[in-house]
């Protein structure tokens, strides 16, 4: 166990400092993802890190949250996710504006329960929420945007990642119609992907009901193939048809978006959150045992805040996304050494040509400058010279005396 003195100057459990080049990559991916959101007209919002505990209703989320008390002894939570704070924001700040509201964000969230489960206690989510429309077109549109954002970050659909799409209302509706007394336990087991428990609970049911309880979670296949939905019709009598028709409409529109090949159907997917009411989806990436993103429709959540508006959206875990991206060659960086006016002018001129320049004022010898350049992942070292720059690639031979324009072409090329 670490001493109190050692703990005092270290990061807290589940958190870490992020250094270059990882921090640079994380911010670059965030920029690309937000750029796709903006291209689709989504407007960014920022909510407080602290919310009153009453804002978060779902027990699992409240249990996972970091808790503290304000001077009035009111319990506060560090936000464990972003959907509920945005639902509160819409009901509180946008109640007089016309829907739909298309909002985006990229903010840190905090969860105690995630420590040791593939996620830090503090991690960054980037996502969108569409509030005020029940149209399946918005479900399809957000899924298509999710695929587009992941592509912009550097993943390729199919080979690098797959969107797994389900319909929370279909399985839940089947259970509530057929075996309401066992439905909560079955839904809890399926949400936790505990198929052994699903099988155990199914044995207590009449054969026809047990067949659906076991069979629906096994309905998995490509979204471009109609076999899954055809098989699902066996379990749709008595009220499940509307959920399947909703799913068909979403798939048709995903085809119009050109994103159907990136989607796999799984009718056993009901989502991790209690508030999902319709289409629900998760994104899995090659080489990672955890989801990179998840989302779905939550038509009842805003009722808690006095605004009965339907909604849908998704969140991307940026740290997980960065962890599965292919390696990238670092951006070119030039360490320019010199403390006189000539060095300042050379740095300005190079930056004017688009060259990233780290200017070090001082008298570093070439060997010292190269060692420093390696420490900051720079590929080039330079010194100001009459008419241009003396330039050397790290680890290579002597210097070239080049005009600023030629030096810029060499560094950027």
From Swiss-Prot:
GO terms for molecular function: histidine-tRNA ligase activity. GO terms for biological process: histidyl-tRNA aminoacylation; L-histidine biosynthetic process. GO terms for cellular component: cytoplasm. Pathway: Amino-acid biosynthesis; L-histidine biosynthesis; L-histidine from 5-phospho-alpha-D-ribose 1-diphosphate: step 1/9. It is found in: Cytoplasm. The keyword Amino-acid biosynthesis applies. SUPFAM superfamilies: Class II aaRS and biotin synthetases. InterPro entries: aa-tRNA-synth_II, aa-tRNA-synth_II/BPL/LPL, HisRS-like_core, HisRS/HisZ, HisZ. It comes from the Bacteria. Pfam families: tRNA-synt_His (PF13393). Keywords: Amino-acid biosynthesis, Cytoplasm, Histidine biosynthesis. Residues 1-21 are annotated as: Disordered. Required for the first step of histidine biosynthesis. May allow the feedback regulation of ATP phosphoribosyltransferase activity by histidine. Heteromultimer composed of HisG and HisZ subunits. This function is generally fulfilled by the C-terminal part of HisG, which is missing in some bacteria such as this one. Belongs to the class-II aminoacyl-tRNA synthetase family. HisZ subfamily. This is ATP phosphoribosyltransferase regulatory subunit. It comes from Rubrobacter xylanophilus (strain DSM 9941 / JCM 11954 / NBRC 16129 / PRD-1). The gene is hisZ.
């Amino acid at each position: 166990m670490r001493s109190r003195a050692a703990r005092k100057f270290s990061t807290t459990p589940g958190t870490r400092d992020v250094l270059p080049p990882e921090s640079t990559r994380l911010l670059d991916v965030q920029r690309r993802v937000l750029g796709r959101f903006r291209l689709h007209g989504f407007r960014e919002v920022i909510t407080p890190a602290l919310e009153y505990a009453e804002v978060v209703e779902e027990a699992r989320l409240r249990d996972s949250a970091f808790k503290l008390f304000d001077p009035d002894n009111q319990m506060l939570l560090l936000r464990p996710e972003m959907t509920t704070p945005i639902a509160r924001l819409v009901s509180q700040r946008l109640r007089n504006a016309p829907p739909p509201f298309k909002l985006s964000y990229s903010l840190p969230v905090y969860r105690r329960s995630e420590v040791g489960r593939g996620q830090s206690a503090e991690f960054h989510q980037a996502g969108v929420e569409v509030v005020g429309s029940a149209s399946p077109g918005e479900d399809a549109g957000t899924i298509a945007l999710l695929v587009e954002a992941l592509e912009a970050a550097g993943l390729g659909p199919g080979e690098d990642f797959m969107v797994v799409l389900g319909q929370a209302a279909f399985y839940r509706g089947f259970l509530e119609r057929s075996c309401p007394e066992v439905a909560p336990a079955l839904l809890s087991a399926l949400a936790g992907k505990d198929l052994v428990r699903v099988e155990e609970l199914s044995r207590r049911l009449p054969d026809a009901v047990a067949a659906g309880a076991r069979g629906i979670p096994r309905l998995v296949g490509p979204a471009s193939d109609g076999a899954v939905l055809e098989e699902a019709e066996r379990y749709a009598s008595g009220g499940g048809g509307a959920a399947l028709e909703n799913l068909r409409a979403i798939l048709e529109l995903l085809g119009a978006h050109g994103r159907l090949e990136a989607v796999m159907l799984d009718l056993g997917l009901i989502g991790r959150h209690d508030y999902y009411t319709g289409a629900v989806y998760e994104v899995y990436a090659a080489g990672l045992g955890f989801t990179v993103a998840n989302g779905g429709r939550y038509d009842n959540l805003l009722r808690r805040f006095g605004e009965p508006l339907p909604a849908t959206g998704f969140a991307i875990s940026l740290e997980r996304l960065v962890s599965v991206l292919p390696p990238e060659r670092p951006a070119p960086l030039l360490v320019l050494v010199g403390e006189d006016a000539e060095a300042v002018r050379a740095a300005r001129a190079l930056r004017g040509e688009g060259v990233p320049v780290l200017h070090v004022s001082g008298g570093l010898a070439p060997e010292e400058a190269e060692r420093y350049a390696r420490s900051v992942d720079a590929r080039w070292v330079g010194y100001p010279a009459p008419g241009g720059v003396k330039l050397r690639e790290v680890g290579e031979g002597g210097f070239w005396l080049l005009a600023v324009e030629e030096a810029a072409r060499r560094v950027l090329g």
